[in-house]
Amino acid sequence: MSELSTRLEAYLRHKLDAPDLTVADLARIPGGASRETYRFRARYGGKDRGLILRRDPPASLIETERTTEYRAYEAFHGLGLPVPEPIALELDPRPLERPFFIMEEIENCTTGSIMAPDPFGPHREKIGQQFYTVMARIAAADPRDVGLSDFEGETDIHAVAMHEVARWEKVVEEDEREPQPIVRAAIRWLKRNPPPPAQKISVVHGDYRTGNFLVDNDGNIRAVLDWEMSHLGDPLEDLGWAIDPLWSGGNVAMPGGMLPRDEAIRVWEKASGLKAEPKALHWWEIFASLKGAAIWISAAREYAEGRNTDPINAFSGWYCLAFHNKVLADRLGARA
């Protein structure tokens, strides 16, 4: 048994008041630059349960707060959305060297690859209907009702867009290792062309896209994952991010490999009770590509400076940044 398994076993025996608990089959799950992710079996009291450990890495692609992610899991699992059940949050680094949390594993499921031209095959329409409906239910939820009204973010519907631009402009300023003229041009355009005020302030998932949810063999979405960037904001932020071309496997007419764009928007509008006004959504789509570029700029720096040498950071800093620079250049050129 590895040292991590031994320490995890000791922690869970105390946390769950289960002196007979044993940890087995602990294995690192590849990917995930903001948290180290492991799966394992916890056996105690006649149970054999699959669990997931999410531990802070020595360095992170983006600065995220594990308490935020855990609370989002709690809130939306409690609301009945397909979200894993959270089990334990530990901010004390002593048990496992770094803060971490534990949640249930959703078994016998897969994710869709953003590199595949048809990631969901015959289930694409069924999955798409669920995907945009779940996103809409997140948008429709009142942050006060789900206990997340104190989340980070701007609560003024007139100021929320510029708040998010400033947030990601700061990331670019802190992490760029070489000039980023296209990104800077996008920031200027977003500032000079503000969108209409937000219709409401919602909990924004922050990374709602293909690759961040699990589906079973029957095409049912079983879990929405990776809530570490969740915050308060304009619900159109999630919609703009979800339909970004990067997640479309080369088929921009089928965002995320699921539904045609117009149908996706209709599903979201119907389920959320909100409107994706074209001018506002266009602004948030350009913002989405800026946000992506800022994240990939951070990835490149983390990898180049040796703080996080996960290959996903090298890929993101190379391919994804170039992709979003091209998207931004095309979109800004079309607006000229």
Task: List each language-model region with its residue ranges.
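Catalytic-loop of the protein kinase fold
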Residues: 203-205, 210
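Active-site activation/catalytic loop segments of kinase-like enzymes and analogous catalytic loops
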Residues: 236-273, 287-306
